[in-house]
């Protein structure tokens, strides 16, 4: 333990980070297919490297025009991120785009289309007919540390990353380039955030920028101070924060020219910044029949409503599935001693209020829509800039009644 207290760190990255370019492409392809055919089955993985994009995976869809237009969808998203010139290391208009997509395996499709409950047990409920697209375990988490009920380190790291992109795109700091990362270290006493210890901001920039005279003061004033003023956290002292701006020095070579990128390689950034556990499954490029995505969203929905209902100050919930089965094989609730009701009662109430069969999750959260591209950067949970169905607090009263 540090003399400053217990130090916890989370990181975020901007939409121009190579891995996030891949997440954005995968989710843009998903959205394009869902917009034309909401029943599309999509599992799309992307790789980017110098001058090249490779999009592979499995898709079953009736959206023939959207499928044929995937190359243009890829290029449009890269350009929207800001890679529009070889001077920035990547150009969506001229990069090579290779598509290698096949159909979903019929062996997987049979378990999703006709779940074990319907196929073997003769269940008549339509929601018993859609099985989980894979086995796996998914976690959801919520904590009353911020208005969005997220851990403070990841919430602050995401705000800094979003602000980096804002000042680049709106011309406040036009010399910034799309690639960037942020990291936040916060000191805790008795699980209360008391001091902002260290902030690291690394951002790609134009070659002719003086780091000490221009970049460092601009980032402090236009990015960090703006975010901290907006945050205005009650218990967090930011007066002595150590700020490290581009601690390696210049950062001109970035994006896919600096590092290759892959879909699904920022799963901790996507979720809770390491503060809560993770089941291991990535989100981007997957349609909601994949419980890696839809069930993780559902568990965030569960956790957030439990905390908002005042049943616990923080809660972590786990659900698990067997491939081809509709009903979860496991549900686990951890309240870390912060509960205001018996944890057994909380778990029972969750089971009564939330239907965690994949078909029910898709129905209740209305997931067969093109809503996924905005989630590809800056986190899937606790977003303050976009409205997402799994962030709604619509089950608070139901949980209170069930208790």
From Swiss-Prot:
Pathway the protein contributes to: Amino-acid biosynthesis; S-adenosyl-L-methionine biosynthesis; S-adenosyl-L-methionine from L-methionine: step 1/1
Binding residues for ATP: 17, 179-181, 250-251, 259, 265-266, 282, 286
Classification via InterPro entries: ADOMET_SYNTHASE_CS, S-AdoMet_synt_C, S-AdoMet_synt_central, S-AdoMet_synt_N, S-AdoMet_synthetase, S-AdoMet_synthetase_sfam
Binding site for Mg(2+): 19
One record GO biological process: one-carbon metabolic process
Keyword field contains Plastid: no
Protein's UniProt name: S-adenosylmethionine synthase
Organism from which the protein derives: Mycobacterium bovis (strain BCG / Pasteur 1173P2)
């Amino acid at each position: 333990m540090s003399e400053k207290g217990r130090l916890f760190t989370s990181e975020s990255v901007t939409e121009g980070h190579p891995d996030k370019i891949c997440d954005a492409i995968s989710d843009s392809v998903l959205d394009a297919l869902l917009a034309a055919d909401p029943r599309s089955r999509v599992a799309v993985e992307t790789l980017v490297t110098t001058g090249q994009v490779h999009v592979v995976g499995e898709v079953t869809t009736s959206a023939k025009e959207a499928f044929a237009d995937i190359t243009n969808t890829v290029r449009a998203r890269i350009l929207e991120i800001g890679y529009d010139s070889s001077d920035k290391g990547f150009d969506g208009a001229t990069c090579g785009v290779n598509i290698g997509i096949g159909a979903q395996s019929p062996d997987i499709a049979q378990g999703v289309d006709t779940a074990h409950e319907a196929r073997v047990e003769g269940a008549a409920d339509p929601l018993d007919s859609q099985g989980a697209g894979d086995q796996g375990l998914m976690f959801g988490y919520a904590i009353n540390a911020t208005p969005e009920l997220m851990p403070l380190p990841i919430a602050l790291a995401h705000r800094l990353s979003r602000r980096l992109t804002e000042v680049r795109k709106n011309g406040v700091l036009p010399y910034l380039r799309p690639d960037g990362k942020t990291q936040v270290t916060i000191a805790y006493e008795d699980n209360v955030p008391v001091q902002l210890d260290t902030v690291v901001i690394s951002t790609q920039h134009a070659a002719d920028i003086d780091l000490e005279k221009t970049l460092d003061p601009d980032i402090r004033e236009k990015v960090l101070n703006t975010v901290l003023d907006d945050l205005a956290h009650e218990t967090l002292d930011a007066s002595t924060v150590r700020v490290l701006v581009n601690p390696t020095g210049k950062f001109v070579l970035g994006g896919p020219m600096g590092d290759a990128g892959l879909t699904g390689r920022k799963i901790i950034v996507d979720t809770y910044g390491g503060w809560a556990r993770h089941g291991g499954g990535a989100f981007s490029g997957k349609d909601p029949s994949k419980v890696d995505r839809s069930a993780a969203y559902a568990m965030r929905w569960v956790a957030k409503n439990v905390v908002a209902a005042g049943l616990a100050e923080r809660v972590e919930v786990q659900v698990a599935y067997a491939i081809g089965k509709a009903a979860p094989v496991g549900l686990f609730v951890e309240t870390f001693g912060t509960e205001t009701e018996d944890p057994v009662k909380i778990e029972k109430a969750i089971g009564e209020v939330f239907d965690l069969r994949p078909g029910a999750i898709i129905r209740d959260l209305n997931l067969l829509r093109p809503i996924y591209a905005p989630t590809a950067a800056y986190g899937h949970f606790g977003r303050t800039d976009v409205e997402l169905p799994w962030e709604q607090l619509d089950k608070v009263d139901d949980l209170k009644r069930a208790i």
